[in-house]
Amino acid sequence: SRYRFGCNIASGAGGIGKLETNCRALFDTGEGAVTGPDALGVSNTASQMVAMEVGACGPNANFVSACASGTHALGEAYRTIAYGEADVMLAGGTEACITPLTISGFTSMRAMCTTGNDSPKTASRPFDANRCGFVMGEGAGVLLLETEESAKARGAKIYCELAGYAANCDAFHITAPHPEGEGMSACLLGALSNAGLPKESVGYINAHGTSTPLNDKFETLAYKVAFEDHAPKIKISSTKGAIGHLLGAAGGVEAIVCCKVLAEQQVPPTINYETPDPDCDLD
């Protein structure tokens, strides 16, 4: 039933490019220059458009939770299926926000790398001692989540199982992570508890690894807090060294990477990691 088929497509900034274009047209020409149903560039448009394209009339939602948006959408899609509200969900994230406003905004927050112009390909260097901020990327990553019964009934190739999910927040600072890794470690433990899995079952983590000084340091700490003695045994890498930070799309793309890691039994490297940082001393 198409009413059992839903969409959770997230975006951190939505149609920010469209919004900037329309603002410019409004100020330069007047209100008649602003046209189109997506004139405001609202984030829920992505989920609406996908649902209309594939005829998905089930639960439909957009999640705007900054860099966690894509993962948030996947997790809530998992819950939607687990709660019996849908059998199939398209879920993930999309982002296209390399625009003057977003670049200026993140630069003003000192989050973006501004010293890598001589070698832009190596500017994004997660966990490296010489990292200086993230490099913005664009893209999309969407997965089809469904019950095991649904997948087998249609003869689908099953890549992996989404076993558990948890969500929380630091309630500490608008951009900086908690200096003791409290929120991140609690979320990791919550996901393991929800999945009914021991810490020792984790062999690989596709890290958030943004290439910012604070995130990479405290993310490493969070892994130590959550996994304790098992933390050094886990292989950890960040995709952002290769493709940059896709913001709201990051979780969707990186979930696909995890699916491929399980399917191929190969772990991707952290591109541009050259100089070890004593604060980021896991594998």
Language model features with spans:
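Short, well-ordered amphipathic alpha-helical segments that serve as non-catalytic structural scaffolds
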Residues: 1, 44-46, 73, 147, ...
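Short beta-strand segments
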Residues: 6-11, 64, 89-95, 137, ...
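Conserved catalytic cysteine-centered active-site region
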Residues: 14-76, 85, 108-135, 223-252
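Short glycine/serine- and small hydrophobic-enriched flexible loop segments
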Residues: 78-79, 146-149, 256-264
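Acyl-CoA/ACP chain-elongation machinery
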Residues: 85-132, 165-179, 207-216, 233-283
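Condensing-enzyme catalytic core mediating Claisen C-C bond formation in acyl metabolism
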Residues: 119-195, 203-204, 270-273
